[in-house]
Regions:
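Anion-binding alpha/beta catalytic cores of soluble intermediary-metabolism enzymes, centered on
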Residues: 1-201, 206, 215-269
């Protein structure tokens, strides 16, 4: 249901999306972008540091991360996908050029079973306090509601319910998870403490919050880069700016382009 809703919105919009092309995964990025365009998800422009052999429009720049974000700032595209450009440099350019103080992202993941769910935090510097996780929860729910989905939120911790008392550190993660879920419920969100049982949470919740950014990043890598799951992109939340982050080692650039196009408001195909 989640992915079908996103695809339908992307096909309706067919928005103008710019995609970053890094040297390490250039061929894969171009192939995915061409498939996204062929499928009608978006009108794609490729941005890289070297000339590209592609059927799509291209922009070549010595600083492709800067050029990518400038296209968005200048209104020449409706949204951007980081693609295979470096994370740190592209996020720095995004913050500087678009005037953002901080970056919050929520990933869409597919489990090996085929079940889709949104997941955060995925950045190692995100989600380290109760307030951070509540903010990610609230803003992530707003994003998900844009696709006509009312999500249930599962807040993970470091242990099963019966593990309380075994470790002060584990106890704190459980206390934090309870506090986050309670705060989200006050705001009208269906949220529960889901303990450490990620494997069960995937089947019960549309949106899952990890204990912190390092845990979230490790879980993403274990599921999508080592296991048989897949990442479909991590859009910004808390802003109308359409920017979808990706993992250079991932395979989901076509999906991230679809996600970006679906998030654009007021676009006609």
């Amino acid at each position: 249901m989640i992915w079908e809703a996103i695809k339908a919105r992307a096909l309706e919009n067919c928005a103008r999306i710019a995609v970053g092309v890094g040297p390490s995964y250039a061929d894969k990025t171009i192939e995915c972008a061409e498939r996204a365009a062929e499928n009608g998800y978006a009108r794609v422009t490729l941005v890289g540091s070297k000339p590209m052999d592609a059927t799509l429009d291209t922009v070549v720049s010595d600083t492709p991360d800067v050029a990518l974000i400038q296209l968005l700032r200048d209104g020449r595209v409706d949204g951007v996908v980081r693609g295979s450009l470096g994370a740190s440099s592209t996020l720095r350019s995004l913050k500087r050029i678009m005037g953002l103080d901080r970056i919050l992202r929520v990933s869409l993941l597919r489990a090996p079973s085929g079940r889709f769910f949104f997941f955060a935090p995925v950045g190692v510097d995100e989600g380290w306090t109760i307030q951070d996780k509540v903010e990610l929860g609230e803003k992530g729910v707003l994003l998900i509601r844009r696709f006509g989905i009312e999500p249930k939120v599962g807040v993970l911790s470091g242990g099963r319910m019966e593990d309380r008392g075994r470790s002060p550190r584990v106890d704190k993660t459980m206390d934090d998870a309870e506090a986050v879920a309670a705060a989200l419920r006050v705001g009208g969100i269906d949220a529960k403490h889901a303990s450490i049982l990620f494997e069960d949470a995937i089947n019960e919740y549309e949106y899952i919050l990890a204990p912190d950014g390092v845990c979230g990043n490790l879980m993403f890598r274990a599921l999508c880069l080592v296991g048989c799951g897949e990442g479909y992109g991590a859009p910004l939340v808390g802003t109308d700016i359409v920017y979808v982050d990706t993992s250079r080692a991932g395979s989901g650039y076509e999906n991230a382009i679809c996600m970006a196009s679906a998030l654009v408001k007021g676009t006609k195909a």
